[in-house]
């Protein structure tokens, strides 16, 4: 049972997933820092409000408060993360397309050898 577990863990997909989760966790911290320390102050500068985007809110009554700043912060984090993932996927797809094109290109030597084979077969028949 232990050897089966080891085989399962050492499979490429599981290792790739583990690396992705670890890098994703680290990347989340970077995106949050970018949003909180760079983007939020810029937005705050233009809105003239609180120094933290998280604290933006709309108070309707004492009991009813809409904390739209926290939502905006999460939307910004999502958009940054989604954009970076998009760029990463686009980059990987470009690499895969380039590799496929290289595989598809026929070797000129093989074409010449095929022509020679065809000529030899034609001579045998004649």
Swiss-Prot record:
Functional summary from the UniProt entry: Channel that opens in response to stretch forces in the membrane lipid bilayer. May participate in the regulation of osmotic pressure changes within the cell.
Main location: membrane
Keyword Ion transport: yes
Phylogenetic placement of the source organism: Bacteria, Bacillati, Bacillota, Bacilli, Lactobacillales
Protein name: Large-conductance mechanosensitive channel
Disulfide bonds: none
GO CC annotations on file: plasma membrane
Membrane topology: Multi-pass membrane protein
Keywords, ordered alphabetically: Cell membrane, Ion channel, Ion transport, Membrane, Transmembrane, Transmembrane helix, Transport
Cell location: Cell membrane
PANTHER family named in the record: LARGE-CONDUCTANCE MECHANOSENSITIVE CHANNEL (PTHR30266:SF2), MECHANOSENSITIVE CHANNEL MSCL (PTHR30266)
Residues passing through the membrane, by range: 14-34, 69-89
Subunit structure: Homopentamer.
Pfam family name, one: MscL
